[in-house]
């Protein structure tokens, strides 16, 4: 197969590993920076130009699109789909998962467990919003935040009101969620490929830090997940329409709660924590499921 990896940096661990595993299995692999692509959008003969070269004859595209370039990156991915190239994760599924509010609404529709979450637009609604999620402490999240940036733990009602009003004053869209104290600053990253959880790790936040993101100094370790956690992760990935996903769960007194479904999960943490060849598993799944023009939208909403 001829595989395109959409990534802005060929030296990133995840990109390197996908290239290595693709080449090891006899495939031709090319790393493409989506921001350097231009598109000829026609119904008869859609094309993508890259550094004055026309990209042709690709069988598969593996998107590794960062949150900051979601709009243009998914536009390029859609163009590949228009050309009949099989996407490991389709453009619609990625945009679903990148919209925190939309993704939570889709998960709620499927009956997936989540922290109680509130959303409002006006400062007048703040008292009702806090009451809705059970009062302080609460977690306040920017809808556009990634890697733990734009996430605040407000331990008192007064602090919560101040933070929410400040964000609203900046015209920022936010979610307010109940704080799951029993999680102890840890979460579970379940790596889903197809309809299976192929690896899982526990991420523990640094001392005094409630966010468990590895980018925020958290640590990762191998973990055994329960059948309920496995089912929840698979259901969450399917709700987004994602073939490859990192599903972040919190362990709570009422069962697993989904925090986020990541459409471009990093490979370094999960491979180091579990010792599994996750990149190879992605290529293996692609080999088994690839078909030309197999670009029909999965999932609904």
From Swiss-Prot:
Protein residues bound to Mn(2+) 2: 260, 262
Domain called ATP-grasp: residue spans: 104-287
GO cellular component, one term: cytoplasm
Residues reported in the UniProt entry to bind ATP: 141, 178-179, 187, 211-213
GO process annotations (BP): protein modification process; SOS response; translation
Cofactor note: Binds 2 magnesium or manganese ions per subunit.
Pfam families on file: RimK, Rimk_N
Known cofactor(s): Mg(2+); Mn(2+)
Superkingdom: Bacteria
Family assignment from sequence similarity: Belongs to the RimK family.
Descriptive protein name: Probable alpha-L-glutamate ligase
Species for this entry: Marinobacter nauticus (strain ATCC 700491 / DSM 11845 / VT8) (Marinobacter aquaeolei)
Gene name, Swiss-Prot/TrEMBL: rimK
């Amino acid at each position: 197969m001829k595989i395109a990896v959409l990534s802005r940096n060929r030296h990133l661990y995840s990109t390197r590993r996908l290239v290595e595993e693709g080449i090891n299995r006899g495939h031709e692999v090319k790393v493409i920076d989506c921001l350097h692509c231009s598109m000829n959008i026609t119904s008869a003969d859609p094309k993508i130009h890259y550094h004055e070269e026309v990209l042709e004859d690709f069988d598969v595209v593996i998107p590794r699109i960062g949150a900051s370039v979601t709009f243009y990156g998914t536009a390029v991915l859609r163009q590949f789909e228009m050309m009949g190239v099989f996407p490991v994760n389709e453009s619609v599924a990625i945009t679903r998962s990148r919209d925190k509010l939309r993704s939570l609404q889709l998960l709620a529709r499927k009956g997936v467990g989540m922290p109680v979450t509130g959303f409002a637009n006006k400062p007048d609604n703040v008292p009702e919003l806090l009451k809705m999620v059970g009062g302080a402490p609460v977690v306040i999240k920017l809808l556009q935040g990634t890697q733990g940036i734009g996430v605040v733990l407000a331990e008192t009602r007064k602090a919560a009101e101040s933070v929410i009003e400040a964000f609203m004053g900046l015209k920022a869209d936010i979610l307010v969620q109940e704080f799951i104290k029993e999680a102890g600053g840890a979460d579970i990253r379940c790596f889903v490929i197809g309809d299976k959880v192929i690896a899982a790790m526990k991420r523990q936040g640094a001392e005094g830090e409630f966010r468990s993101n590895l980018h925020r100094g958290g640590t990762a370790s191998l973990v055994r997940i329960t059948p309920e956690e496995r089912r929840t992760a698979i259901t969450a990935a399917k709700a987004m329409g994602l073939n490859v996903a990192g599903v972040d769960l919190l362990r709570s007194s009422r069962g697993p709660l989904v925090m986020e479904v990541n459409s471009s999960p990093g490979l370094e943490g999960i491979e180091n924590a579990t010792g599994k060849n996750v990149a190879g598993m992605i290529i293996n799944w692609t080999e088994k499921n690839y078909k030309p023009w197999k670009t029909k939208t999965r999932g609904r909403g």
